[in-house]
Amino acid sequence: MKPTVWHHLRLCPHGHPDETLDDAAIAVDETGTIVWLGAFSALPHGYAHWQREDLHGAWVTPGLVDCHTHLVYGGTRADEFAQRLAGVSYEEIARQGGGIVSTVRATRAADETTLFVQAAARLQPLLAEGVSAIEIKSGYGLDLASERKMLRVARQLGERFPVSVYTTFLGAHALPPEYAGRADEYIDEVCERMLPTLADEGLVDAVDVFCERIGFSLAQTERVFEAATRRGLPVKLHAEQLSNAGGTALAARYRALSADHLEFLDEAGIEAMKAAGTVAVLLPGAYYFIRETQLPPIELLRKHGVPIALATDHNPGTSPLESLLLTLNMGCTLFRMTVPEVLQGVTRHAAAALGRADRHGALEIGRQADFAVWSVGSLAELAYWIGRPLCEQVVRGGATVFRRMNG
């Protein structure tokens, strides 16, 4: 790759629209590393003969980060969507053997190639919106072989597409049918066999649990957290989505990277998150899709200064969403978040929710040049437009990996 100066751009280096620089430039060396950024008029003479790319006044932000997805799975749950429209609740569907378990059956039946092809089709719309880092959870296998299959596919996506993929083992997502009535025994399997094996195979970056009355108890969640901690793995938690089960306080005790959903989070849980440095990941796509009415406590999160991230929560049952930009709009319209909050929610704070704030979410000297180029007049348009293609170009490590074709 030739050293390149990207110039005549409007720079938003940290994802905050109040911290910008007009007519800026970014110098990227042959390794894809940012070696200088600032006002184009102040470009040092040493870069005068580098290759130039004129962005004609376009906005540049850090590559976006989708910090909570379930992108790898088999089948769809369109039939359950119809059930919910007829008045059947998400919890009722789950108790009838639908919900997560129906996707488990489809995922177990699919081979790696099928799962890869299906997941790749879901990933590509996100890449075309400037996503350069993404978390992908397991949790639709619920046995060792199937969880391994999911995590292997996630790793393959990161190898074959220009995106950093971070894997999360979510073996404690639901109780598999063969363990009906034996939840503690299943947690034994998760902690003593599945997690150690998959971690030893290098397939796990973090560990998550679905802590809820239709998921796993606080005691069971803590067992998984203990097992993860013994392996030196960070933890995350699906928490307080359907009720206040106290999961967030537990997550904070283990200094979780994030607690996610949080519609029923209380102030005590928020205070614990703040003290632990745990990021609040809000998922408006799921809130919208299952027609929830309990809003997450945005004002209390603001009051206590808890960093807020946003993510698609792409999954087949409650958020079949393939647009992080639409997620921004939902964060504003449904949760009344501000434009600066949602933009930081998919850059700096989303990177922190993955424990990767040193690698993603900001443009700084010494970092890899991962950025998105936007054809908008103001950054507010990223959250304003619905369905309009706004990303003109995506750069990874200084190389253009996506360019929108006009006409």
Swiss-Prot record:
Q: What is its EC number?
A: 3.5.2.7
Which SUPFAM superfamilies does UniProt cross-reference here? Composite domain of metallo-dependent hydrolases (SSF51338), Metallo-dependent hydrolases (SSF51556)
Key words of the record: Cytoplasm, Histidine metabolism, Hydrolase, Iron, Metal-binding, Zinc
ATP-binding as UniProt keyword: no
GO-annotated molecular function: imidazolonepropionase activity; iron ion binding; zinc ion binding
Report one GO cellular component: cytoplasm
- InterPro entries assigned to the protein according to its UniProt record, in alphabetical order: Amidohydro-rel, HutI, Metal-dep_hydrolase_composite, Metal_Hydrolase
Enzyme class, one word?
hydrolase
* Gene3D superfamilies on file: Metal-dependent hydrolases, Urease, subunit C, domain 1
Q: Which residues bind Zn(2+)?
A: H68, H70, H238, D313
Q: Where does the UniProt entry say this protein principally localizes? A: cytoplasm
Which pathway is this protein engaged in?
Amino-acid degradation; L-histidine degradation into L-glutamate; N-formimidoyl-L-glutamate from L-histidine: step 3/3
Amino acids binding N-formimidoyl-L-glutamate = Y140, N315, G317
Keyword Glycosyltransferase: yes or no? no
Compartment(s): Cytoplasm
Residues annotated as binding Fe(3+) are H68, H70, H238, D313
The record's catalysed reaction(s) read: 4-imidazolone-5-propanoate + H2O = N-formimidoyl-L-glutamate
As for what it does, the entry says: Catalyzes the hydrolytic cleavage of the carbon-nitrogen bond in imidazolone-5-propanoate to yield N-formimidoyl-L-glutamate. It is the third step in the universal histidine degradation pathway.
Q: Which family would the database say this protein is a member of?
A: Belongs to the metallo-dependent hydrolases superfamily. HutI family.
Name the HAMAP family on file: HutI
Query: Know the name of this protein?
Result: Imidazolonepropionase
List the taxonomic lineage: Bacteria, Pseudomonadati, Pseudomonadota, Betaproteobacteria, Burkholderiales
| Gene that this sequence comes from | hutI
